[in-house]
């Protein structure tokens, strides 16, 4: 039996704070750390000193890039709870870093979505929300910046409903707004809460609800109680009988429905003005899940069967590495979430994906940028290990006697690449090491050498993503590099099916080469990927040569059909062929497969695909005409227009090739007042004139 835990599992919360880039997420996280007693001097983002944003660049750019994990403790606003541990995983809000968000959502149990009371639900919020839906993460909403001009709580609540298709249930209402924002109404306790400005909101007073708000409070309180009552027949009966529920019953009902992803409780405040954050922490404990409230994580056992691990110290150890970071003091830090069992520093763990055993050096618990060495971690904990060499993001580490591979993470394919070369000979060797380390940290960033030009090519999710990589090489590894023009990651595919023979025969003195195959090459749905099927009957091509044929096809697909870009979304079936007892070899069949694909694909109506980006531009009305005209010139397809307090919103799909340097152009079109976000949407067929120009350029 495991020894006793410091804090029981049901009093642990693993949460993320997710938000659009300017909703005030870092400030909210800061205040959480301040009130939980971790951080004594509040960091302010606009002074560039926030505790969570620990990489220099983030401090300069004022945006959060790396998801650091922080542990803090909370006893409740009125010290009403036993001690709870809250692990916060900081998630970035910038669209070039959705991979980081994905990675952190994978290991969270619940999340707080921060919305700006003025900007409301912005495009990035939608992206992150969709990702959270995919992982079934229960959420709370916090409408922040209630003190800002244009703040409107109920408008944001409606946007959560309309734009995110969620079911928001306010459990607070703001008292006043903009500079008159004074505090909040707690709908459960039916009290007004005013935080004390003299001690930065550490203390507060409860008061009666202002007269002029009573009618509205009654209306929203009824909606909240109905939402709670719908959690069970028992509560519904009590509500119908008494016309009310006790605060305990309301919390119980809301918790049940939040955990089932049926509702999103909404709170409000101003993190910057120190209002509302402690109540938000109480809500994290009241409504978000502990590790024991979420289903057991599934995975593949060593024998290939499906297995699972539930949150218990008594189960075998299993954890998922979700972040690798280089640390100037201790070297490589591997952040991981423990799903089951106990791990002590000095123990050995097994990495089933790499098939390697490794010893854990030190275990650290991170309090944003300070760290505490700990002796052990248990189910539900989030910590960092020092000394793991082969583990990369998304790998499982587990007990070698009970091997399991936990669900892997899916990482998107890069859409943009640039050639990069070291400025000096001295930078040459360092650059290889630096890029290798950065690629280990970030699976959406790739490095390869172009065989023809021998240039080093780096690929990523957007211009900002690659800029930051180059910047980090300079700062962390002291490598100066020249960066080429960004290149688009085009793809090729086919539009019709063909059957094609590939026959490779070489007779020279002695043993010859003989491989003969017939392939059926067919288009697949966009995004469906590559499929290879063996339909050989009667052994006309022996089974041992089939993998070689597939390898030949795959290699040829990398070389493209007309323009040299990788081929995607095709199905290749080998259905006929012949072999020679003496002369056939894997090599011969690989070449035959490659020949058949090359010839067949070129007859299958090949087309060039280009990445299309989903772009959202927010512009003051007076620049609308210029902005739309410019987007049309960039081959943009306008999808819709909307209003927001920040200006007109234009939703548009634009080929990535037309978007280079857009930030600068948009600034000059709108005198710096318009903003945009962009994320990868899909690959689509390039118009023939564009495709021809690209093919010509490639040849």
From Swiss-Prot:
Enumerate the subcellular locations listed in this protein's record, separating them with semicolons.
Answer: Cytoplasm
What sequence ranges are listed for the domain tr-type G?
10-292
Q: Which GO terms describe its biological process?
A: ribosome disassembly
Q: What does this protein do?
A: Catalyzes the GTP-dependent ribosomal translocation step during translation elongation. During this step, the ribosome changes from the pre-translocational (PRE) to the post-translocational (POST) state as the newly formed A-site-bound peptidyl-tRNA and P-site-bound deacylated tRNA move to the P and E sites, respectively. Catalyzes the coordinated movement of the two tRNA molecules, the mRNA and conformational changes in the ribosome.
| Upper taxonomic lineage | Bacteria, Pseudomonadati, Pseudomonadota, Gammaproteobacteria, Legionellales
**Name by which UniProt lists this protein:** Elongation factor G
A Gene Ontology molecular function term for this protein is: GTPase activity
SMART domains, sorted? EFG_C, EFG_IV
GO CC terms: cytoplasm
Q: Which HAMAP family match?
A: EF_G_EF_2_B
């Amino acid at each position: 039996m495991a020894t006793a835990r410091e804090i029981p599992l049901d009093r642990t919360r693993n949460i993320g704070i997710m938000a659009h880039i300017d909703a005030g997420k870092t400030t909210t996280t800061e205040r959480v750390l301040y009130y939980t007693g971790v951080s004594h001097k509040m960091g302010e983002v606009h002074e560039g000193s926030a505790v969570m944003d620990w990489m220099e660049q983030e401090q300069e750019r004022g945006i959060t890039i790396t998801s650091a994990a922080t542990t803090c403790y909370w006893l409740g606003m009125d010290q009403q709870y036993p001690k709870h541990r809250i692990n916060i995983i900081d998630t970035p809000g910038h669209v070039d870093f959705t991979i980081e968000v994905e990675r952190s959502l994978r290991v969270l149990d619940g999340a707080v979505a921060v919305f700006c009371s003025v900007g409301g639900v912005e495009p990035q919020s939608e992206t992150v929300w969709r990702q959270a839906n995919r992982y079934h993460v229960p959420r709370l909403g916090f409408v922040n910046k209630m003190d800002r001009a244009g703040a409107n709580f109920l408008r944001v609540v409606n946007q959560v409903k309309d734009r995110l298709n969620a079911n928001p249930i306010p459990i607070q209402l703001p008292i006043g707004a903009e500079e008159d924002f004074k505090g909040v109404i707690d709908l459960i306790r039916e009290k007004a809460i005013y935080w004390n400005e003299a001690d930065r909101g550490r203390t507060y007073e409860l008061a009666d609800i202002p007269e002029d708000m009573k009618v509205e409070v009654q209306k929203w309180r009824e909606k909240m109680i109905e939402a709670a009552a719908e959690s069970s027949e028992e509560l519904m009966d009590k509500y119908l009988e008494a016309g009310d529920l006790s605060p305990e019953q309301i919390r119980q009902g809301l918790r049940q429905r939040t955990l089932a992803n049926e509702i999103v409780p909404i709170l409000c405040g101003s993190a910057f003005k120190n209002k509302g954050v402690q109540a938000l922490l109480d809500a994290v404990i009241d409504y978000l899940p502990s590790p024991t409230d979420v289903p057991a994580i599934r995975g593949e056992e060593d024998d290939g069967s499906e297995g699972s691990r539930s949150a218990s110290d008594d189960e075998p150890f299993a954890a998922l590495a979700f972040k690798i970071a280089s640390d100037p003091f201790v070297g490589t830090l591997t952040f991981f979430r423990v799903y089951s069992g106990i791990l002590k520093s000095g123990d050995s763990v097994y990495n089933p994906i790499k098939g390697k055993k490794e010893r854990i050096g030190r275990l650290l618990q991170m309090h944003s940028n300070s760290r505490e060495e700990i002796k052990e971690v248990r189910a539900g904990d989030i910590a960092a290990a020092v000394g793991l060499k082969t583990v990369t993001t998304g790998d499982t580490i587990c007990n070698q006697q009970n091997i399991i591979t936990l669900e892997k993470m899916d990482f998107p394919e890069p859409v943009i690449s640039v050639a990069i070369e070291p400025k000096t000979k001295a930078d040459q060797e360092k650059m290889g090491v630096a890029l290798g380390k950065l690629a280990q940290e970030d699976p959406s960033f790739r490095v390869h050498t172009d065989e023809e030009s021998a240039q080093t090519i780096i690929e990523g999710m957007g211009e900002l993503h690659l800029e930051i990589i180059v910047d980090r090489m300079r700062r962390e590894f002291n490598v100066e590099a020249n960066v080429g023009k960004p290149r688009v990651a085009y793809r090729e595919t086919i539009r019709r099916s063909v059957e094609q023979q590939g026959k490779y025969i070489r007779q020279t003195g002695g043993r010859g080469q003989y491989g003969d195959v017939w392939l059926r090459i067919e288009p697949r749905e966009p995004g469906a990927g590559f499929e290879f099927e063996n339909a050989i009957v009667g052994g006309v091509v022996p089974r041992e040569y089939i993998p070689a044929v597939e390898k030949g096809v795959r290699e040829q697909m990398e070389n493209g059909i007309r323009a040299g870009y990788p081929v995607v979304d095709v199905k290749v079936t080998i259905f006929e062929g012949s072999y020679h007892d003496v002369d056939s070899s894997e090599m011969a069949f690989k070449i035959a497969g490659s020949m058949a694909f090359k010839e067949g694909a070129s007859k299958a109506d090949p087309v060039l695909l280009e990445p299309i980006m989903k772009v959202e531009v927010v512009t003051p009305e007076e620049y609308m005409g210029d902005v739309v005209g410019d987007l049309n010139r960039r081959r943009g397809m306008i999808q819709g227009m909307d209003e927001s307090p920040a200006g007109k919103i234009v939703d548009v799909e634009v080929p990535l090739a037309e978007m280079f340097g857009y930030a600068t152009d948009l600034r000059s079109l709108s005198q710096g007042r318009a903003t945009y976000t962009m994320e990868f949407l899909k690959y689509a067929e390039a118009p023939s004139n564009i495709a021809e120009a690209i093919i010509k350029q490639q040849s």
